[in-house]
Curated annotation (Swiss-Prot):
Source species of the chain: Serratia proteamaculans (strain 568)
Annotated EC: 2.1.2.3, 3.5.4.10
Example of a GO MF term: IMP cyclohydrolase activity
Lineage: Bacteria, Pseudomonadati, Pseudomonadota, Gammaproteobacteria, Enterobacterales
Any single Gene Ontology cellular-component annotation: cytosol
Sequence ranges assigned to domain MGS-like in this UniProt record: 1-148
Protein's gene: purH
Pathway, per record: Purine metabolism; IMP biosynthesis via de novo pathway; 5-formamido-1-(5-phospho-D-ribosyl)imidazole-4-carboxamide from 5-amino-1-(5-phospho-D-ribosyl)imidazole-4-carboxamide (10-formyl THF route): step 1/1; Purine metabolism; IMP biosynthesis via de novo pathway; IMP from 5-formamido-1-(5-phospho-D-ribosyl)imidazole-4-carboxamide: step 1/1
Gene Ontology biological-process entries: 'de novo' IMP biosynthetic process
UniProt name for this protein: Bifunctional purine biosynthesis protein PurH
């Protein structure tokens, strides 16, 4: 059985100095000798702590502008030396055991994320000594504790106090895992950065540098295990990025309710990303990753009421997302009207939380307010590979539109067209959305032919008794034939917004003119598979 190991000597060298003075002080108060380097050593000395510079300890100065500091046998021998096995050779060379290494690495990711970061800047932020010490300590975790996260400082001090200044083997093992994860993620970032530069450095002007590296290394942190995946025979877990910058389902705090399922998370993401498209108070109701009702209003209560009207049947057991704080009136309207799986909003008022507490099975998430949408990559696994593309942040404004029909859209038709175009972006292809007065009235999703999506949208509107005449229709991609326009005209659509680009555009435009429909081209497609 592995024994607890006392901490008598620690080497501290950190880039992120949050909490390091307090941690070092706590170690010193418990009799731990402190070794340190560079800026960390100066910080500790300025705080009045007894600290020995590594250069004084090794008798070898820092050199090459700090490139060589800790790469010395007295450092790595002290870390890698096996207690009880290498003691004689360590004594022969005056190598003292180092029982704890506290290191985090140069901020490479933050450096290369800066606009106009040069290759020289990137290179100078590649840590060499840090990862070497981290790996050495993690390798010898039987005898050495390696600390790479400031969030572990408090727990380490508590355990030392409970174990006469020692750390248990299980703790050292867990810390070693974090250390290997830390260096793996760090090396992955460097490999991705340099891999993305390959085309430019080989004279390939067709492939933009900085987007798609030669090899792609992904690092995600497990947030939770799940009872099962999309289906009950599939195991699943939820992994998140380490430093998520945009409010999302990954950052959301669950305030109540059962654990989120795989499908809950997928559907909640779809709802939240859709509602982010709107500046006005908006509500999106999602079922099976497709919006089934979307509306904007003077406030979120009116937005919810109108979104629900689109398809009350599908809204049952759905996911509801808002882009404003959830208030008590809206919470009451939801729980008195329907069964809901998840509600997500930037924040939840205390009054709304009190009301929702009576429905403990409802999962309630507060995700925080988003200031902007972050450009990132999207991934889709295929058997044996991974498709990678830019996240679809594209959206048109009124100035981007081209009216291609004889009739110009009215101001109201134009507003409705832009509204349902935003919704169509989040509907599975082939996608057709009918909208009127900033409210969806029919959604046709995921059909193999576009005309059937148009027909389904009309059927949905008719089933709910919603007036289609004078409404706008959005299509996520071009119409390959005129039949979709004929189907829209048959139910009273007066304005169509679509990307255009079909070899039969002239035929489709002619159909719009025959029916007196205003037709708008966006010149932007929003396939969603």
């Amino acid at each position: 059985m592995q024994q607890p190991r006392p901490i008598r000597r620690a080497l501290l060298s950190v880039s992120d100095k949050a909490g390091i003075v307090e941690f070092a002080e706590a170690l010193s108060q418990r009799g731990v000798e402190l070794l340190s380097t560079g800026g960390t050593a100066r910080l500790l000395a300025d705080a009045g702590l007894p600290v020995t510079e590594v250069s004084d300890y090794t008798g070898f100065p820092e050199m090459m502008d700090g490139r060589v500091k800790t790469l010395h046998p007295k450092v790595h021998g002290g870390i890698l030396g096996r207690r009880g096995q290498d003691d004689a050779i360590m004594g022969q060379h005056d190598i003292k055991p180092i029982d704890m290494v506290v290191v985090n690495l140069y901020p490479f990711a933050q450096t290369v994320a800066r606009p106009n970061c040069s290759l020289e800047d990137a290179v100078e932020n590649i840590d060499i000594g840090g990862p070497t010490m981290v790996r050495s300590a993690a390798k010898n975790h039987k005898d050495v504790a390696i600390v790479v996260k400031s969030s572990d400082y408090a727990a380490i001090i508590t355990e030392m106090d409970n174990n006469d200044g020692s750390l248990q083997y299980t703790t050292r093992f867990d810390l070693a895992i974090k250390a290997f994860e830390h260096t793996a993620a760090y090396d992955s970032m460097i490999a991705n950065y340099f891999g993305a530069l390959v085309p430019a450095y080989h004279g390939d002007t067709e492939q933009p540098a900085g987007r798609f590296p030669r090899t792609l290394n992904l690092n995600y942190i497990k947030k939770q295990d799940m009872r099962y995946g999309e289906n009950s025979h599939q195991q699943a877990a939820f992994y998140i990025e380490e430093n998520v910058q945009e409010a999302s389902v990954a950052t959301a705090e669950q305030l109540q309710g059962k654990a989120l399922s795989y499908n809950n998370i997928a559907d909640t993401d779809a709802a939240l990303e859709c509602v982010k498209e709107f500046a006005e108070p908006a509500c999106v109701i999602v079922k099976h990753a497709n919006p089934c009702g979307v509306a904007i209003g003077d406030d979120i209560l009116s937005a919810y009421e109108r979104a629900y009207q689109t398809d009350p049947t599908s809204a049952f057991g759905g996911i509801i997302a808002f882009n404003r704080e959830l208030d008590a009136a809206t919470a009451q309207a939801i729980i008195s009207r329907q069964f809901v799986e998840v509600i997500i909003a930037p924040s939840i008022s205390q009054e709304a939380r009190s009301l929702l507490a009576a429905k403990q099975n409802v999962r309630v998430l507060a995700c925080g307010q988003w200031q902007q949408r972050i450009a990132a990559l999207d991934f889709k696994r295929v058997n044996g590979g991974l498709l990678v593309q830019d996240r679809d942040l594209g959206m048109v404004s009124e100035g981007d539109l081209r009216v291609v029909s004889e009739r110009q859209p009215t101001a109201q038709e134009l507003r409705d067209a832009l509204f349902c175009w935003k919704v169509a972006k989040f509907v599975k292809s082939n996608a057709i959305v009918y909208a009127r007065d900033n409210m969806t009235i029919g959604i046709g999703a995921g059909q193999m032919s576009r005309v059937y999506s148009a027909k389904i949208a009309g059927i949905k509107a008719a089933d709910e008794g919603l007036e289609v005449k004078g409404s706008a229709m959005a299509s996520d991609a071009f119409f390959p034939f005129r039949d979709g326009i004929d189907a829209a005209a048959a139910v009273g659509i007066s304005c169509v917004i679509q990307p255009g680009g079909s070899i039969r555009d002239d035929e489709v435009i002619a159909a719009a003119n025959e029916h007196g429909i205003a037709m708008i081209f966006t010149d932007m497609r929003h396939f969603r598979h």
